[in-house]
Curated annotation (Swiss-Prot):
Belongs to the heat shock protein 90 family. This is Chaperone protein HtpG. GO terms for molecular function: ATP binding; ATP hydrolysis activity; ATP-dependent protein folding chaperone; unfolded protein binding. Residues 1-339 are annotated as: A. Residues 560-632 are annotated as: C. It comes from the Bacteria. Homodimer.
Length: 632
């Protein structure tokens, strides 16, 4: 096949500019990324080799070899993994196939440490070679293809690259970096080994380099024709916990999660019994950019008897734990396991149950930490993944109680929007005669905190949970009680504070009788806008509020459904009025502007709970007219 020159995809040009000009101070990452890619190529060969053993071509010992040539000023990274065909080389090295290209560029922060980590996360690590090289040559042959179908790809990291057909006996890929001026410090065994041991010690493949020894005559270190393994070269999860340092766990996490930050916590154990497997699970410190995308692929890396099977085995974890990263290595699953088999396998169901329990135990340890560092970690976790965890109440009935104990909310107990109150905390502070856990839902913490529905609760010193996450209304349809105490909305149905409001009830009944004619006329004036108008004792400072009937959808949920473009059933709220408020006391059912006052009280109540007016212009006109009549 003839020599061919092709242009990079536009995003690649932008990326190359970033690599060369923005990440220089963190240049060591080039080796981390290229070794990681070589490891992935070996994993892919193992997986495809399960179905076709001939792909190994009588060379079953997989390895990565790193070399350098001082005279030529080159570094080579060579693997005998799956390799690439011509089309794959163009697709993998000339374009960014992933849909997250735009997100990649919007995530760049200018912090070189963080930006360097994003490179791996977005699958563009190959281009990091241009940080230290002004030309990269890739020679590759895909396993199973004849020697004359190998490919040479070459680029100087500018606008284009060349593709040539070559002969290559060895399957796999050899990447040659032609170093830029000033990068000669990398042409040293000691330097390259230190980078490998820093970033890639956990790679399960042996990483080989030629041995080096002192030559007395030359007075320098010289390379020998003998290889040595420069990394641990064993799957980290197969080692005993006592043999793995925290730093090694952290490096391994950063490798599999493509994350620059340390994990919040991890757990590592071997399970024996009905199913035998090893699990190594990590909780990240921050959410990935695409956690809420519909096509987000969570899941764990699945190995069977140390053979890599797949990257994102979603069947091993429920959806609400999709943020958990890690590895499961099963001793029981067949090596030819497919996603279809995973869905039906009893062994997988047993593993899923065990992994879920272990992940929840990990979160419980964080949540119950007594020390400040542990508390801070759970706060970080909740900020990143709290909304995802709430999904578990509807998804995982068996573990619902455990999940409920992990939930955190803002509340009226503190004047802050921090979600740090557990349901157990709330119950421990309940009044002796209080029988329910009270909550209010709203779009924002400010709206929830200032809701008129809270007035009587403040007066009585009763704590109310302030729920402002979009998932909360859905969550509440599964969370009906905690510790035997039912959850109750302060904006739904008749408010019953038990013995806490006996006096108010008597006063309410008396006041209700006194203004009964006004209440009846208000219902007439508002018509179908409301289901009912009634006197309330839940207000102390506001003249009116809206509440939903016990079996009706809340106003907040209606607004949320409409915002999502869904049809929300038309609901009639109940208008409650405060008979002690000066505005209500002055209502005259026989006055000409009585209807305007009724609509004003309704509209005010709707606005106070974060609702939208159907006709803002009429509201303004009506308000102005009433103000003018009062002024006159």
């Amino acid at each position: 096949m003839a020599h061919e020159t092709m242009s990079f995809q536009a995003e690649v040009k932008q990326l190359l500019h970033l690599m060369i000009h923005s990440l220089y101070s963190n240049k060591e990452i080039f080796l981390r990324e290229l070794v990681s890619n070589a490891s992935d190529a070996a994993d892919k060969l193992r997986f495809e080799g399960l179905a076709d053993n001939a792909l190994y071509e009588n060379d079953p010992n997989l390895r990565i070899r790193i070399g350098y040539d001082k005279a030529a000023r080159t570094i080579t990274i060579d693997d005998n993994g799956i390799g690439m065909s011509r089309d794959e080389a163009i697709a993998n090295l000339g374009t960014i196939a992933r849909s997250g290209t735009k997100e990649f560029f919007t995530k760049l922060s200018g912090d070189q440490q963080k930006d360097a980590a994003l490179i791996g996360q977005f699958g563009v690590g190959f281009y990091s070679g241009f940080i230290v090289a002004d030309k990269i040559t890739v020679e590759t042959r895909r396993a199973g293809l004849p020697a004359n179908e190998a490919v040479r790809w070459e680029s100087a990291g500018e606008g284009d690259f060349t593709i040539d057909a070559i002969e290559r006996a060895q399957r796999g890929t050899t990447i040659t970096l032609h170093l830029r001026e000033g990068e000669d410090d990398l042409l040293s065994s000691h330097r390259l080994k230190s980078i490998i041991q820093k970033y890639s010690d956990h790679i399960a493949l042996p990483i080989l380099m030629r041995k080096e020894e002192w030559d007395q005559e030359k007075g320098e270190m010289v390379l020998k024709d003998e290889d040595e393994t420069v990394n641990q070269a064993s799957a980290l999860w197969t080692r005993s916990k006592s043999d793995v340092t925290d730093e090694q766990y952290t490096q391994f996490y950063q490798h599999i999660a493509h994350d620059h930050q340390d994990p919040l916590t991890w757990t590592h154990n071997r399970v024996e019994g009905r199913s035998e497997y090893t699990q190594l699970l990590f909780v990240p410190a921050h959410a990935p950019f695409d956690l809420w995308n519909r096509d987000y692929r969570g899941g764990l890396k699945l190995y069977v008897k140390r053979v890599f099977i797949m990257d994102d085995a979603e069947q091993l974890l429920p959806q609400y734990l999709r943020f958990v990263k890690g590895v499961v290595d099963s001793a029981d699953l067949p090596l030819n396991v497919s996603r279809e088999i995973l869905q039906e396998s009893r062994d997988v169901k047993a593993i899923r149950e065990g992994v879920t329990k272990r992940a929840l135990s990990m979160l419980e340890e964080l949540a119950n930490a007594e020390d400040d560092a542990g508390k801070e970690k759970y706060k970080t976790f909740w900020g990143a993944f709290g909304q995802v965890l709430k999904e578990g109440l509807g998804e995982d009935h068996a573990n619902r109680e455990r999940i409920a104990k992990l939930l955190r909310f803002a509340s009226t107990h503190g004047d802050t929007d921090a979600q740090d109150v557990s349901l157990a905390d709330y119950v421990s502070r309940m009044k002796p005669e209080q029988s329910k856990i009270y909550y209010v839902t709203a779009d924002t913490w400010q709206a929830a905190k200032n809701s008129p529905h809270l007035e009587v609760f403040r007066k009585k010193g009763v704590e109310v949970l302030l729920l402002t996450d979009r998932v909360d209304e859905w969550m509440l349809s599964f969370l009906h009680e905690f510790d035997g105490k039912p959850l109750a909305s302060v904006a739904r149905g008749d408010l019953d504070l038990g013995e806490l409001n006996d006096e108010e009830k008597k006063a309410q009944e008396q006041a209700g009788e006194a203004i009964k004619p006004v209440v009846e006329k208000m219902k007439e004036a508002l018509g179908d806008k409301v289901k009912e108008v009634r006197v309330t004792f839940r207000l102390t400072d506001s003249p009116s509020c809206l509440v939903a009937d016990d079996n009706d959808m809340s106003g907040y949920l209606q607004r949320m459904l409409k915002a999502a473009g869904q049809n929300a059933p038309a609901m009639q709220p109940i208008l409650e009025i405060n008979p002690e408020h000066a505005l209500v006391k002055q209502l005259n059912a026989d006055s000409a502007d009585f209807g305007d006052w009724c609509h004003l009280l309704f509209d005010q109540a709707l606005l106070a709970e974060g609702g939208m007016l159907d006709d803002p212009a009429s509201f303004v006109k009506r308000t102005n007219a009433l103000l003018l009549s009062r002024a006159a």
